[in-house]
Amino acid sequence: KVEKLQSKVLNEQREVVVQLPKGYAENPDKKYPVIYRLDGAGNLTMMNAVLESLQSQNAAPEVIIVAIENTDRLRDLYPTANEDPNGPVGYGGGGANFLSFITTELMPIVEKKYRVHDFRVIEGASAGGVFALYALSQKPELFNAALTYSAAVWWNYGASAKSTVAFLKSANHLDHFIYTSIGNEGAPMRPYYNDMISGMRANQPAGLRWENEAYEGVTHNLVSAASTFSAYHHLFLSAYLRPQQFSGDIKSIKDYYARVSKQRGEKLDAPEWVIRELGYHYVGKQNYDKAIALFKYDIAEYPQTPDAYNGLAYGYEQMGEYKKALESVNQALALSTSE
């Protein structure tokens, strides 16, 4: 759906394309996270292909996409005017106004007309990547994540690289996600980008999830295509906690699903089989104490589910604790026959 609005901040008419999830009309009570995609609806085909693949595996939620069309791209997406002769001198500097347009004019319309919850992502490439980093640093209370592809941080002698590092350095804790990537960039881009990555690594605050990837041999204009799957895959938490994501602390299961719930705007708990599979994983590693603790936690969460007791029985059997295994099997049978 195309939304047109007359912006008082920018003093011009702006156009955005709002794409709703396929099941939007069939789920009138459901709310969705929002991706604000810079550089317009030309990105929707690629975004949809990646998101649908992830959604088919429950590895990403359904989302509302707000694709913002350009009018004066350099003006809007660069926060500072460029003084570096490697680029167009005097261009840029309208980022603050553009951010104000998004947060004070566009967002209120989106949140009034559509069923959204408060998990918001800002995503962009090149100049759009610069703006996404800027938006997160200026409005961390509004954006939960910034996805940036080959962000043109060389602009104005690396102003964006420096401000991004300064933002992270000033943050004691940041419960956000940042994705950065780069292709086969040379000068003037690469030195500023490398400095930014080094600074981000040295000043990464507690709580920040950050992924950085380099796609050597991939040109600047193809980095978005190379990065989109990885960015979404790292950003969105699967509804199914995998063993490699499990810290080993049972409390972390609830913490993980609290974060999944925050992303998806609905309360999600660990499915019974997910907890049981974690137990099986530790049986396979012969870490029986951890496995038994997980199986017992599974029973505590799902006391009326026979399979939870079967998991515990399996753990005890592998330990050679046959009496305890038999007790668990009998509990599973009792529940099965009472159903």
Show which residues each predicted segment covers:
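Non-catalytic cap/lid and distal C-terminal segments of serine-dependent acyl enzymes
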Residues: 1-319, 328-331, 337-339
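Beta-loop motif signature
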Residues: 322
